């Protein structure tokens, strides 16, 4: 779990997201509170509940981007799900408890990686021995092995092909629910894994080069050194105490006033979410998981519905409300120039792979921001995503002809932008800009 202060979390988010300080501060405080709670006495720790957040704002202003960046910062089990993917219990589809089961799988992956790093040195030594076995045989004399070991460490044998045996990894085959036992999701491969382990583990022979064999062998050796039961226990504990669930598109399951149709199913999903957000115990194949201290961050555009259309009980379980503002021309300009991986930097780097030197003047950046704002106001406001449409249109010809213009220098100015995008009023083919 991250130990960043709220100020550090906000400054980290500032590298990728322009504006929206209220939302950044809210998630920064919530993330820091996870760490603060861990410092308390055990008696008080159980009483401190996370303050769940509801982010409200139009599309394309940074709600989902905040969640993506938060996931990398958190250093804790984090899952982002769309509320629309779930159905009420009894209907065909995924029930909301699957969110927690998926979160536990993510937690296991995180803990496993951490444990692998702890035993990496030992695993590397084991991998080296296995490579030597493949090169000179297990019965070779110590002198021969030492001679090859020196060559191996010097990189002289990197391109030599060898046959190695590695443990079979599951290929993600689908699972099935056991009727009458929610949460007891058994994958087809889980069963074969059980039989494989009972017979000493399943392996497969792979032909590869010495250099590329190390990754598989180190992973293999690491897995032998770590205890899966410990990983599962730690993962469940990590999910219960530090887990974060980001519920996107929550406005799509709100009952719109006077709306007809699938209202019952929508309300059912909300009712199923209630115990999850409030605190319940979910059965998973790794044991029961309590959701009392999992942080839930919900977000939605609320274009056609409003937060008050959500069930009152669910509203009460999302006590912190943050409104994200629509983007202005100045915001668009900053998005193009100030963010760490801005679109302009991306396109300059992409064209540089073709030895094409691309440059944007200050007035070109102003023109791009201006066009994006005008298109958003006249067609459909899709926020910062509009910039991708505009940039793609402006650089359409350059991208196509780039391989034939290697070594050239191309300057993009406002005239070039206007010429290729055209004034909104004069442009008849508006469909190009509608995503």
Curated annotation (Swiss-Prot):
Pfam family, one: AAA_2
Keyword vocabulary terms for this entry: ATP-binding, Chaperone, Cytoplasm, Nucleotide-binding, Stress response
Binding site for ATP: 18, 60-65, 248, 313, 385
Record bears the keyword Transmembrane helix: no
Endpoints of the signal sequence: none
Gene Ontology cellular component list: HslUV protease complex
Domain of life of the organism encoding this protein: Bacteria
Subunit structure: A double ring-shaped homohexamer of HslV is capped on each side by a ring-shaped HslU homohexamer. The assembly of the HslU/HslV complex is dependent on binding of ATP.
Function in brief: ATPase subunit of a proteasome-like degradation complex; this subunit has chaperone activity. The binding of ATP and its subsequent hydrolysis by HslU are essential for unfolding of protein substrates subsequently hydrolyzed by HslV. HslU recognizes the N-terminal part of its protein substrates and unfolds these before they are guided to HslV for hydrolysis.
Family, as annotated: Belongs to the ClpX chaperone family. HslU subfamily.
HAMAP family registered for this protein in UniProt: HslU
Protein's UniProt name: ATP-dependent protease ATPase subunit HslU
Lineage: Bacteria, Pseudomonadati, Pseudomonadota, Alphaproteobacteria, Hyphomicrobiales
């Amino acid at each position: 779990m991250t130990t960043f202060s709220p100020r550090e979390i906000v400054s980290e988010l500032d590298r990728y997201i322009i504006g929206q300080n209220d939302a950044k501060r809210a998630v920064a405080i919530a993330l820091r509170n996870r760490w603060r709670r861990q410092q308390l006495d055990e008696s008080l720790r159980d009483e401190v509940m996370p303050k769940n957040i509801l982010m409200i704002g139009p599309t394309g202003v940074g709600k989902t981007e905040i969640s993506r960046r938060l996931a990398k910062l958190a250093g804790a089990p984090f899952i982002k799900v769309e509320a629309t993917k779930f159905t009420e219990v009894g209907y065909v589809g995924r029930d909301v408890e699957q969110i927690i089961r998926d979160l536990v799988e993510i937690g296991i992956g995180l803990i496993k990686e951490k444990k692998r790093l702890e035993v990496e040195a030992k695993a590397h030594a084991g991998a080296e021995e296995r490579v030597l076995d493949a090169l000179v045989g297990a019965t070779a004399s110590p002198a021969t092995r030492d001679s090859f070991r020196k060559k191996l460490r010097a990189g002289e044998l990197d391109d030599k092909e060898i046959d190695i045996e590695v443990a079979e990894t599951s290929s993600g085959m689908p699972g099935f629910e056991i009727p009458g036992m929610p949460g007891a999701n058994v994958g087809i491969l889980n069963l074969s894994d059980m039989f494989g382990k009972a017979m000493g583990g399943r392996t497969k022979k792979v032909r590869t080069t010495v250099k590329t064999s190390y990754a598989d062998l180190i992973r293999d050796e690491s897995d032998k050194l770590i205890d899966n039961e410990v990983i599962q226990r730690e993962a469940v504990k990590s999910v219960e105490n530090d887990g974060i669930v980001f519920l996107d598109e929550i406005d799509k399951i709100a009952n719109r006033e006077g709306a007809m149709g699938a209202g019952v199913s929508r309300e059912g999903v909300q009712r199923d979410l209630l115990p999850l957000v409030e605190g319940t115990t979910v059965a998973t194949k790794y044991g029961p998981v309590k959701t009392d201290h999992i942080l839930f961050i919900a977000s939605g555009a609320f274009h056609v519905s409003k937060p008050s259309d959500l069930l009152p009980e669910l509203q009460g379980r999302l006590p912190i409300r943050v409104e994200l503002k629509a983007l202005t021309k100045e915001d668009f300009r900053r998005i193009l120039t100030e963010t760490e991986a801005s679109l302009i930097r991306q396109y300059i780097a992409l064209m540089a792979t073709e030895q094409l030197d691309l440059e944007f003047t200050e007035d070109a950046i102003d023109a791009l921001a201006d066009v994006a704002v005008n298109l958003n106001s006249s067609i459909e406001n899709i926020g910062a995503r509009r910039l991708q449409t505009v940039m793609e249109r402006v650089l359409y010809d350059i991208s196509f002809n780039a391989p034939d213009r290697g070594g050239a220098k191309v300057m993009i100015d406002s005239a070039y932008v206007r010429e290729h995008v055209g004034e909104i009023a004069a442009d008849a083919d508006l469909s190009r800009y509608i995503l």
